[in-house]
Amino acid sequence: MRSAHFHTTDNGLSLLHATSIFPATNNKYWGRMFVWFDTMPTAPMWAHWSIVGAVGSGNDTEVRLGGQYDGSKNRFGVGTDHGPTGDWTNLDEDPGNPVPVDSWVCVEWLHDGGADETRFFWDGVEHPSLHTTATDHGGPQSQQYVLPDFEDVFVGWWLYQPGTTPGQFDVWIDEVALDDSRIGCSL
């Protein structure tokens, strides 16, 4: 068995897409994967990256799971681009530890379009600071965070800013699972 290896230079992207699981019952699905980061960006300030994203119809919101360099460390984060709430990322505050490098980490997520809710788990532990709802999110509070009717989910590595330090990234992803209920980290 081999892991999927994603190699990028600077602000590159390397992704695998899954569409066959959609439409999901009640527009809700759980995901789980194991991720190994060889390094994380340390420049530019606020370098922003994704390892999971989902899009669909109904609106142009792209739901993201990834993280951001805050000037001292990379932290996991959830957020979006496009859609009525715009581009935002909530960073992990539980307790806000850096994303581990050179070790496997189990990442789990919920995208519930029926309830307009997302959740994030790291090594089996939920991080409530990364829980979003239609009215509790990182965008303008005057706008509801409405999730799309999911049609496509990607996993991989996507770094958005150019001029990164270091100049290349290697990420390995293994044991990706998508289901209508929580999967967990046990293999």
Which residues are covered by each model-predicted region?
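Short surface loop/edge beta-strand patches of beta-sandwich-type extracellular domains
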Residues: 12-27, 93-96
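A carbohydrate-recognition surface predominantly in extracellular/luminal proteins
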Residues: 23-39
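Localized edge beta-strand/strand-to-loop motifs within extracellular or lumenal beta-rich domains
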Residues: 103-119
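Short, aromatic/His-centered strand-loop micro-motif at the edge of beta-sheets
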Residues: 80-106
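Flexible glycan-contacting loops in extracellular carbohydrate-active proteins
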Residues: 131-171
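Glycan-recognition/cleft segments
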Residues: 47-82
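Extracellular beta-strand elements of beta-rich domains used
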Residues: 33, 107, 171-181
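Short carbohydrate-recognition loop motifs
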Residues: 1-15, 74-78
